[in-house]
Amino acid sequence: MSTPTKMVTDHAGRPIPALTPGDSQRVAVGSSSAQSTALDSETIIVRVQSDVACYLAFGDNPTATNTDLVLPANTVEYFGVTPGSKVAVLQFGGAGYLNIVEMR
């Protein structure tokens, strides 16, 4: 398990919830499930965004299906993940791209 990041504070010492962007990937969204490469062994949160609606699955060897979580088009979401896992994506309607950013 990775060590939590130190919380950033404002001028009055109040915590500001913030994460630093790390490595990123772009995965094609199509009619077959596609996987990202394995996330870093320290990554526990990812930021995802797609230009099309799509289904997402997470795990060691995930396959996204039409019963998985739906990410609406042009929406940013953050998910907790297991270090070293992968993200799988499947189109909901049309083809596009899923952007994944490992947050630290």
Describe the residue ranges of each PLM region.
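Short, intrinsically disordered N-terminal pre-domain segments
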Residues: M1-D23, V101-R104
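Surface-exposed ligand/attachment interfaces on beta-rich extracellular proteins
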Residues: P17-E42
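Hydrophobic beta-strand residues in large extracellular and virion-surface proteins
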Residues: V27, V48, L56, V87-V89, ...
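Short, solvent-exposed S/T- and G/P-enriched segments that are highly enriched in secreted/extracellular
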Residues: V29-A34, N66-P83
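Short hydrophobic/aromatic-rich beta-strand motifs
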Residues: T43-Q49
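Short, surface-exposed beta-strand/strand-loop-strand elements in extracellular ectodomains
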Residues: Q49-T67
